[in-house]
Regions:
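Canonical P-loop GTPase G-domain recognition
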Residues: 189-244
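Nucleotide-state-sensitive switch-loop elements of NTP-binding domains
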Residues: 14-41, 45-54, 59, 63, ...
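Conserved C-terminal guanine-recognition region of P-loop GTPase G domains, centered on the G4
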Residues: 146-154, 159-210
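Hydrophobic residues at beta-strand termini and immediately following loops
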Residues: 5, 105, 214-216
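Long, basic/Gly/Ser/Thr-rich N-terminal segments
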Residues: 1-16
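G-domain G4 guanine-recognition motif of GTPases
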Residues: 56-57, 82, 86, 140, ...
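A short, charged, Gly/Pro-tolerant segment at domain boundaries
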Residues: 241-260
Length: 260
């Protein structure tokens, strides 16, 4: 974990009698929440849906966004992606080669994106927010720390590759509990790897009962058209994000109006 994550800190020693303790992790999260709220107002004023895409490394986030960008391009819709990685801009260059407006963020040793990083990346977007149809924040590959940090998104999306197994929601409950939408990716490989769909759905229902679930495949394109329709025209009106925070118990609130 990185030095800025609350989960990286050792338990503090007992405080002397009569003293006050300021938990730096809490202060960091509070500052991030304030910056995220400002971003959310900015996105709402632009009428722009924004996704925070979270997954394990290698789950297929970038490949999925390449195909989603192609699908949107056929409809004359504009997609932009802010790409978070510890090092290199390889994924951003992949997306740019596919015709997607992409801005990289290299976090160094930080295992997640923060609202301030996103705000700085917005200044490097070649198009104003008002001219975009969808903005995706591709978070650093990690199912732990990103769950704690609000980025001003209107929807939080967790991608679970079928190659990772059915038990990921049980092992990493905070990320899945925080999701408005869970994507079962690489769905064309489910039979090959013996993915138990019913068991995965049961785990998701236990951990993330308010999340919508969609199956997609970047390789075959299956589910992408339906996914795009859902993102741009959800069945229920999205409510304003209710951020209750990810404090202590490792759980956070979601926009319940985004259920499918």
């Amino acid at each position: 974990m990185c030095a800025t994550c609350p989960c990286a800190a050792d338990p503090p020693p007992a405080a002397p009698a009569g003293s006050r303790r300021l938990t730096l992790g809490q202060a960091l999260l509070q500052r991030n929440d304030q910056q995220a709220a400002a971003l959310r107002r900015r996105f709402q004023q632009a009428g722009l849906p924004v996704l925070n895409l979270i997954s394990s490394p290698g789950s297929g986030k970038t490949a999925l966004l390449e195909r989603l960008g192609a699908e949107m391009g056929q409809r004359n819709l504009r997609l932009a992606v802010i790409v978070g990685d510890l090092a290199t801009d390889r994924d951003a260059r992949r997306l740019a080669a596919a015709g997607v407006e992409a801005v990289p963020i290299s976090t160094g040793q930080a295992c997640h994106l923060e609202a301030a990083m996103v705000a700085r990346a917005l200044e490097r977007l070649p198009l104003p927010l008002e001219r975009l149809d969808l903005l995706v924040i591709e978070n650093v590959g990690n199912l732990v720390c990103p769950a704690a940090f609000d980025l001003g998104e209107s929807l939080r999306v967790v991608l679970l590759s079928v190659c990772e197994g059915e038990d990921k929601p049980l092992k990493y409950p905070a990320s899945f509990h925080s999701a408005d939408l869970v994507l079962l990716g690489k769905s064309d490989l489910a039979g090959v790897v013996g993915f138990d769909r019913a068991q995965a759905l049961a785990h998701l229902e236990a951990v993330a009962p308010g999340a919508a679930v969609r199956e997609v495949s970047a390789r075959s394109g299956a589910g992408l058209e339906a996914l795009l329709e859902w993102l741009l025209h959800p069945r229920e009106p999205r409510q304003e994000w209710e951020w209750r925070g990810w404090r202590g118990a490792g759980m956070r609130g979601t926009a319940k109006g985004a259920e499918g």
